[in-house]
């Protein structure tokens, strides 16, 4: 299963990136042995993409000492797709901060997620999951920020705002919260 699901991402193109991370030497060895046999059932072009990715610097199998090392790699790598193949995949989710899409268990291959399951396929790539989310409804909604201070709030914030504005060289900003504002109010 791990070998099949690793190939899903590696066949996209020779610029793809995919890693199988495991704490099990047996899983790593079985996947490494199985992957070439699956290439025989792919078009020559897709098999070559997969071969290039999995034998280059942007893909492969990583054997880690413990799951903490796996979490660290995942959160640093920030994958576009993360499939967790374990007996209890849900228990790992709380440790993942940076992944665009997380698929849980052996019955949730990326193929199904891409074509049928429903999660958005417009996902942050190349580590962008560290700071971005998948495309969603909020990307198409327009919002306005609204702020309002009362006189006391203005007085509380004015002097600090004036300091920041002066430091940044924005005299108009500083004047709008300083003595000129008080003077202008008196002329109203």
Residue ranges and their predicted role:
Residues 2-5, 23, 27-35, 66-69, ...:
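General structural feature for long, well-ordered alpha-helical segments within catalytic domains
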């Amino acid at each position: 299963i791990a070998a099949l699901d690793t190939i899903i991402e590696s066949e996209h193109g020779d610029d793809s990136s995919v890693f199988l991370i495991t704490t099990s030497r047996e899983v790593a060895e079985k996947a490494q042995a199985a992957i070439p046999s699956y290439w025989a059932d792919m078009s020559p072009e897709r098999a070559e993409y997969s071969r290039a990715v999995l034998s280059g610097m942007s893909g492969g199998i990583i054997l880690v000492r413990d799951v903490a090392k796996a979490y660290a790699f995942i959160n640093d790598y920030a994958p576009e797709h993360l499939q967790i193949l374990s007996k209890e995949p849900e228990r790992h989710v709380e440790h993942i901060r940076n992944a665009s899409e997380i698929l849980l268990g052996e019955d949730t291959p990326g193929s199904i997620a891409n074509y049928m399951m429903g999660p958005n396929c417009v996902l942050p790539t190349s580590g962008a999951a560290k700071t971005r989310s998948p495309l969603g409804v909020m990307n198409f909604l327009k919002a306005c920020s609204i702020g309002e201070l009362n006189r006391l709030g203005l007085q509380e914030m004015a002097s600090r705002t004036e300091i920041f504005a002066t430091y940044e060289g924005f005299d108009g900003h500083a004047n709008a919260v300083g003595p000129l504002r008080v003077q202008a109010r008196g002329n109203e």
